[in-house]
Amino acid sequence: MNLSLREIQKLLVTVAADVARRRLARGLKLNYSEAVALITDHVVEGARDGKLVADLMQSAREVLRVDQVMEGVDTMVGIIQVEVTFPDGTKLVSVHDPIYK
């Protein structure tokens, strides 16, 4: 299987997001990398499902609450920017203050 660098990166985000989901299900708090991966995956999959940029910017802010992440992670993640492909082209989705307080 020959994957491009972009495809490899997308797969790594997906795997990290799956790990984060399993840890949340066990009641564990997420670290920085897990939180970013989970929110990033939400945006990528939402774009794949045909959702609008504005809708994804809002819904991504509801993926995680402050009580689901380790102490300080909410302040470390000020903005997440994800370049994703929509039916009408590639766009940069910016999610400000992505962890719900």
From Swiss-Prot:
Protein keywords: Cytoplasm, Hydrolase
One Pfam match: Urease_gamma
Record-annotated disulphide pairs: none
Listed name of the protein: Urease subunit gamma
Assembly description: Heterotrimer of UreA (gamma), UreB (beta) and UreC (alpha) subunits. Three heterotrimers associate to form the active enzyme.
Pathway it works in: Nitrogen metabolism; urea degradation; CO(2) and NH(3) from urea (urease route): step 1/1
GO BP terms in the entry: urea catabolic process
Family matches, as InterPro entries: Urease_gamma (IPR012010), Urease_gamma/gamma-beta_su (IPR002026), Urease_gamma_sf (IPR036463), Urease_subunit (IPR050069)
Molecular function terms from GO: nickel cation binding; urease activity
Reactions performed catalytically: urea + 2 H2O + H(+) = hydrogencarbonate + 2 NH4(+)
A cellular-component GO term for this protein: cytoplasm
Subcellular location: Cytoplasm
Presence of the UniProt keyword Cytoplasm in the record: yes
Protein source organism: Ureaplasma urealyticum serovar 10 (strain ATCC 33699 / Western)
EC id: 3.5.1.5
Main location: cytoplasm
Enzyme class, UniProt record, top EC level: hydrolase
Family under the similarity heading: Belongs to the urease gamma subunit family.
